[in-house]
Amino acid sequence: MSLLLTIAKEYKRLCQDAKAAQMMTVGTVSNYTTFKKWTTSRKEKNPSLRMRWAMSSKFPIIANKRMLEEAQIPKEHNNVALWEDTEDVSKRDHVLASASCINYWNFCGPCVNNSEVIKEVYKSRFGRLERRKEIMWKELRFTLVDRQRRRVDTQPVEQRLRTGEIKDLQMWTLFEDEAPLASKFILDNYGLVKEMRSKFANKPLNKEVVAHMLEKQFNPESRFLPVFGAIRPERMELIHALGGETWIQEANTAGISNVDQRKNDIRAVCRKVCLAANASIMNAKSKLVEYIKSTSMRIGETERKLEELILETDDVSPEVTLCKSALGGQLGKTLSFGPMLLKKISGSGVKVKDTVYIQGVRAVQFEYWSEQEEFYGEYKSATALFSRKERSLEWITIGGGINEDRKRLLAMCMIFCRDGDYFKDAPATITMADLSTKLGREIPYQYVMMNWIQKSEDNLEALLYSRGIVETNPGKMGSSMGIDGSKRAIKSLRAVTIQSGKIDMPESKEKIHLELSDNLEAFDSSGRIVATILDLPSDKKVTFQDVSFQHPDLAVLRDEKTAITKGYEALIKRLGTGDNDIPSLIAKKDYLSLYNLPEVKLMAPLIRPNRKGVYSRVARKLVSTQVTTGHYSLHELIKVLPFTYFAPKQGMFEGRLFFSNDSFVEPGVNNNVFSWSKADSSKIYCHGIAIRVPLVVGDEHMDTSLALLEGFSVCENDPRAPMVTRQDLIDVGFGQKVRLFVGQGSVRTFKRTASQRAASSDVNKNVKKIKMSN
């Protein structure tokens, strides 16, 4: 009795609180799970069983009453209760509902067309489906397939970004207020951030979905796969269907017929070879021709020369135009100005020189055109028609494109027409150092301005302000362009109009013959410059997986693994008897020439940048110490030689010499990157590929004939004998002794025994003498 009285008193006390009274009088007191959840903090032992038990009740879930009424979901459908007008005890304005309520909303609720949103979210998957539809399947062959496991891209992307760069882009696109400080990538690609913001603005997508879309758009999804043949992303995404260990399914994948992708590939390769040729101080034009003719690309299953692809393509980008002019090709009446494509429509200008002052002191000349001309311009998604006369942009009409592209297109047109106050007095932030390249070549003032607007958004807007700001005519609202590139601005730029659709490029069947100057400037027969090396966009880190760069200067352009292998192969070929070969340089202790061999220089870009000085100090010390003591192995010297190019620097050494792709070699220890065996010192294995070490003296196909030489025999070691090369042996007299590098770099003493003597008859005797001299 006392227990019941205690409960009654507690109940009366709780009822003094309105919310508690409502819960105990209106709520489902019989619902054990509700009170169990509120009165215990222990972990559920069997959550799956508890969930099934809870869902077996009549109304296991809650729903927003207002949303149910707006969606016109009835309380009952086909004699099945969907929800009841009983307020839930745990959440205000929510009522109890059954699982059938969800089924009714899915099948009988209001229709919502989300097809466009779904296509946008899963764009990469739909793109893969479309590419599979384009595949041309051929015959199935049964044969042994030589597959190699490599890191490949399994998804084609328009622009490849690193994982950290994608995260920065996601933060700056979706969470501007919470984003960290701008990294170098954000500062250099802020236009991309604005483009992504405008792309996903006012779309019914939550931020998690947009983050997923951004990752799929820029992530090529690299994986380690056993591959064979061409390793283009379009082919790698279905490599499982193209072959196995004993069969090959012939097919033409979508990458072969994808004209835009092929054009981008050719453009990227041309950009690389142009920049490599420009880095050459002398004969840049001849170097460019050499690079083009020594390069080939794999198109599908076919290996084609880059020279043929350049002459066939209709691409008018500056890099392709430079390569085409180097080959003496023809082009339509087009020209390039930075990343902007231009095509003249009418008019013929006359060059006139004028002067602009840098920091108010130094006068710099630039050229402009005095007569009126009309042009078509194109930059990314924006197009334009404009007219120039004297030093002004008379008018311009911009079609299509996002705000950022329209702004940059207008800025480049202003610079091309020499429009604005900055062609009278240069911006204060432009210094004398901006007027020349690192090699000391002069940069024309218009390209100095192009570089200036790329440095910051403030510089770009400062140039646009120099165009002039006027009040927008109410009748032209929607067709005038504001300073931010928008259509509906209260104040707009002078003589700049916008139309919604793109402007079509005018066609021209007339072709012009191109020539290339030593400064890598393409010009036509009238002397008009149509493209220069300064028009090329900033170099991008691109790995060419299906391009063959045969020229030794371009070894670094291969994928890094192949470049390391080819670099070591080139060093091993220097194990000859020439004066400039590695054994001779070691004998003369000419370390400076050894560290600056062309093959060593070509491998220098493959070394980890932040450790190159420390690695150089360690590698040089290893080489000099071994040579000084006389106990060295040419194999080990070859291993560390690529790390000796840079100036030595003090620092902590962790025992391994790393390349930029995180692979490494370790002095005195074999690994997958570089290995060799004393049992068979005629081969060096680099990334599993056997490279034969050239034999300095004797038949390259006979390991037992290392010391055999026609007319000579091995004798006891005589340090007084002169060191000679193989080319000088013809001058050695009868009975004279000389020293020569043999085998893998060992020094042996030889004696002239006859003018002509068959080396094959002395095999056993000479080999025995070599062993005795050891």
From Swiss-Prot:
Principal location: virion
GO MF term (any one): RNA-directed RNA polymerase activity
Compartment list: Virion; Host nucleus
Source taxon at top rank: Viruses
Example of a GO biological process term: cap snatching
InterPro entries found in the cross-reference section: Flu_PB2_2nd, Flu_PB2_6th, Flu_PB2_C, Flu_PB2_CAP-bd, Flu_PB2_middle, Flu_PB2_N, INV_PB2, PB2_helical
Single GO cellular component term: virion component
Keyword annotations: Cap snatching, Eukaryotic host gene expression shutoff by virus, Eukaryotic host transcription shutoff by virus, Host gene expression shutoff by virus, Host nucleus, Host-virus interaction, Inhibition of host RNA polymerase II by virus, mRNA capping, mRNA processing, Viral transcription, Virion
Role played: Plays an essential role in transcription initiation and cap-stealing mechanism, in which cellular capped pre-mRNAs are used to generate primers for viral transcription. Recognizes and binds a wide range of cap structures of target pre-RNAs which are subsequently cleaved after 10-13 nucleotides by the viral protein PA. Plays a role in the initiation of the viral genome replication and modulates the activity of the ribonucleoprotein (RNP) complex.
Quaternary structure annotation from Swiss-Prot or TrEMBL: Influenza RNA polymerase is composed of three subunits: PB1, PB2 and PA. Interacts (via N-terminus) with PB1 (via C-terminus). Interacts with nucleoprotein NP (via N-terminus). Interacts with host ANP32A (via C-terminus); this interaction promotes viral RNA synthesis.
Listed HAMAP family: INV_PB2
Family: Belongs to the influenza viruses PB2 family.
Protein name per Swiss-Prot or TrEMBL: Polymerase basic protein 2
Gene giving rise to this polypeptide: PB2
